[in-house]
Structures are given as C-alpha cells and as structure tokens.
C-alpha cells in the first residue's frame, strides 16, 4: 500500500532538466541554454559532449563543469539542478568573473522629477547690450618715411594683441616701409612727438617712421592732406585715406560757381541762376542770393565810370611805377591779320609763262619748216624720173608735185615768211654750237623716224585736187 504501484510507475514522465552554461573566462558570452533529457543524456560524459557542441568554446572540448560563484567542480549528472547556472571549462583552472551579470541590461534608476514650478525672478542687474560692446578690430595706421614727401603713405593693420609688444610692432613697420638707414627704431607723430608704446597709437592716424637718424621736421600734414581731415573718431573703421575737402560733388557747388561767373556783370545782362523744383533747392538758393548781392555791391564799386571795362586794374601796381610807356613810330612793325592785308597782284609768273610758250612755239615751227623743206626737195628730185618712166601719168600728178614743191604763190609766200622769221635764230644757234654740233644734229635727223607731212593749201587748190581725183577715178 505504501510503495508505488506498477501502473503509476509506468505512467510517470521522463525527467528533463534545463541549465544555462557560460564559458570559462569569457566576460562577453551571455550563456547558452542546454536541455538534459533523461533518455538521451544518460551519463555525465554525454552531458559534456552536449555542452561542447552548444557552447563552442575556443579552448576545445569541455572537460569540467563549475558553479558560477564559488567555482565548485561538478562530477556527477545527479548534482546538476534544473534551471541552474554553470560554467563550462577545459583543462584550465576556474576563472572568477561575475558570470551571472553578463548579458543583463542594467536599468538606470528614474530620477525624481520636481513637479513644483518656481516663479520667474526679475533681475535688476544692469548689463550692457551686445551692440554696445566695442569690437576688437585691428588698429589701422598710416606710415610715412622720414623726410619723404613724395611717396604716398602706407596703410598698416596691427592686431590688438600685438600692440602690447612694441618690438613686434616696429618689426611690422620695418616690413611695410623700407628706409635707407635700415630698420625702423622709432615712430613719431606729424608734430614730432615720440611714440613709446602701442597704447599711444590711435586708429586712423599718420606716423613718421624713423631709423637711426634724427627726426626731420617737415610739413608732412600740409603737403599730404588738410589738417581738418586728420582726426577721426575712435573705433571708426579706417579703410582708406581721409576724404578730400572741397570736392566738386559737394552741395551747392553749382550755384556757387554760377554766382562767381556773374561777378562784375550788369544787372540787365547778368544770367539768372537756373530754377529747380523741390523744397531743398529753394532753401539752397537763399545763401547764393546773399552772396550775389554782396559781391555785386563790391563789383559796382570797382568798375570805373569811363566805361573801360572790368579788366582794367583799379589801382596802379607797384611793379609799373616809374616805367615809361614806349610810343609807336614809323619803324614799329605791326602784324596785321591776313584778311586785313591789301591784295597784291603778281605779274612775274604770267610773263615768264608767256616767254616760255613763245620760245616753244618757235622751236616747233623751225623743226617743222626744216622737215618740210627737206621732203619737198626730195619729191622735186623724184618727179622728173617718174615723168620719164610714165609719160601718160605725168600730167595727172603735176598738181600734187606743184603743191609739195612750192610752185603755188600762196603756199610759197607763207613758207617764205616763216623761214624769214626763224632764219636769224637758226643762224645764231648754228654759229654758237660749231661744226661738231652740226654734224651731231645731221646724224640724229637721219636716225629719227619720219614725221607726218604738213602742207598748207588754199580752198581753190583743194577744189582742183578733188576734181583731179575724180577724173583719175573715172579713167
């Protein structure tokens, strides 16, 4: 009755254990779950084999099983409890680590949130606004070489931190300006005051760089710029040289020039200033009117009554005192403009042209006369031969031969007159040139090509020639 019945033992379930196994000495291995089935894992060696495949330790096969806290070694399968934690190791000794805390996420404790809302406390501390704080801009100065009034001023930017080191400032000035004496040792103001530290440098001011020589007192300020433009407010950005005073673009400059041009002119002929629209222009005209009125009064006083003009000096100058005025006389040469000079007729050029034309015409007539005489003589000599060879045609050709031979009375008279006029000139030239020139001319005449024959005939001869030509054509 007290012992278990065979039926109950037959119906009992097999024992199954589940354990978590860690690696020996591995702080990052979170453990591996291993299930021990009673039928499959019947001995401790089979359990070690199952743990070796599940853990996959780098040291190889698992040979020992330890408890995680004390490192107690387990030798039998019955000592393993279900749901327990164990450490699997090889031949090495047990390594103490906090295996149970490996892989657990630590929860941070929640801080107590203060739900109370404090009221706003208005502070009475006076703090300057951001835009009122001075910016740490570099100090800008303009440098001039000692005794140099020609070269322009050089602009140098000095950081604020470098102003405390005066030697460093002088080194920067030396790199910017080259002196004949060498490095820059001192800085002076334009008035000649020595600058001993960087705290004395003012932004936008001009300084003279001096080497080992002495400071040369020269009018630097008068030659470079106007004194009114030297000073600048502290903290203003000096990006360029001071502006020029009296520029053309200043307001009211046009009206001021116009008022100057009207000085000394009469009231009727003086041009009036241009009228412009706008309130500003009406206000700007007021000072110009005052200037015109003041200057016009002075100008009326300076103009003399004898209407000599405004360009005559009102008083005698000291340079001209005692000087005698030179009067003009007959020998004084006066230059007159071209349009006021009397017109002159030049006859010399026309006379010269006439004489040259007459000489050329005489030469042409003499040449033509000589050639005509030569050709007429040759034709007269050839005429008897033609008459002997052809007796029938002698009468027909008698009229042309007579014209060329000079048998006509009118033709003969004209030729005789021309030869009589030109014969003296030809004789004089022949005597002067001599026998050699005569031979040269004869040779040149023989080499010259024949010129066209010139014959002078009367109207009656022309009619006779035409009738002879007509009869010969009919025959």
From Swiss-Prot:
Functional note: Protein that plays a role in the inhibition of canonical Wnt signaling pathway. May be involved in neuronal migration during development of the cerebral neocortex. Involved in the control of ciliogenesis and ciliary length.
Biased amino acid composition, Polar residues: 252-272, 455-475
SUPFAM superfamilies listed in its UniProt record: Doublecortin (DC)
Family annotation (PROSITE patterns): DC
PANTHER family attached to this UniProt entry: DOUBLECORTIN DOMAIN CONTAINING 2 (PTHR23004), DOUBLECORTIN DOMAIN-CONTAINING PROTEIN 2 (PTHR23004:SF5)
Spans annotated as Disordered: 234-475
Record-linked InterPro entries: DCDC2_DCX_dom2 (IPR033036), Doublecortin_dom (IPR003533), Doublecortin_dom_sf (IPR036572)
List of residues that carry Phosphoserine: 270
Pfam family, one: DCX
Annotated TM spans: none
The name this protein goes by in its record: Doublecortin domain-containing protein 2
A GO BP entry: neuron migration
Species this chain originates from: Rattus norvegicus
Keywords, ordered alphabetically: Cell projection, Cilium biogenesis/degradation, Cytoplasm, Cytoskeleton, Neurogenesis, Phosphoprotein, Repeat
Comp. bias intervals (Basic and acidic residues): 353-365
Gene Ontology molecular function, alphabetical: kinesin binding
Encoding gene per record: Dcdc2
Positions with biased composition (Acidic residues): 407-419
Localization in the cell: Cell projection, Cilium; Cytoplasm, Cytoskeleton, Cilium axoneme; Cell projection, Kinocilium; Cytoplasm, Cytoskeleton
